[in-house]
Amino acid sequence: MEQRRVVITGIGTINPIGNSIEEYFRNLEDGVSGADTITAFDATKFASRIACEVKNFDPTVVFERKELRKYDRYSQFALVAATEAVEDAQLDLEKIDLERVGVVWASGVGGMQTYYDEVMGWAGGIGTPRFSPFFVPKMISDLAAGHISLKYGFMGPNYSVVSACASSNHAMIDAMNLIRWGKADMIVTGGSEAPVIIPSIGGFSSMRALSTRNDDPKHASRPFDK
């Protein structure tokens, strides 16, 4: 079977050194570090108190209030990046067979913040199991892919890839193969995480997987240093 040629037609991002492709590339070229002291929560009692956080992102500016009830932070990032990518590709959705456009999106932990908030809310109560109806939809790792498809009406292949730190790479490989093999004409692919939260930092700290050079965040990451 002859395999189809695959090209990248649009890109988008939101990350610790840029909330758009233009800002990201500019800061990347200038050697800007995204590492700093954690601001998402009080990390003073943690062994590692530094992280690379997304900065200057206000979801209320991007999404309507009723939408935010449905989106964990990792899904918010996914929608921001995917929207920029679709716009960058200059797609004319009225001339595209939406049944041939899919989404393969990755997330290693999905909506861990949602899970943490709901469980802590229950634990701090009187034992009555009162959980938000959005708990499960916000938490599971494949909802970001679903939200992207719902926004644009894409009806092609749609699923999430979870393979730890390789999740996004695997998602992009899957997306490429779906096009090469004729299963889809276009795929929105990538990955998103929102891991700077208490259980994630606490868990990785207990594994000694995070730097404790808290006095020098910009130079703390040195994976090959003894």
Show which residues each predicted segment covers.
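Structured loops at beta-to-helix junctions and adjacent beta-edge loops in soluble globular domains
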Residues: 11, 106-108
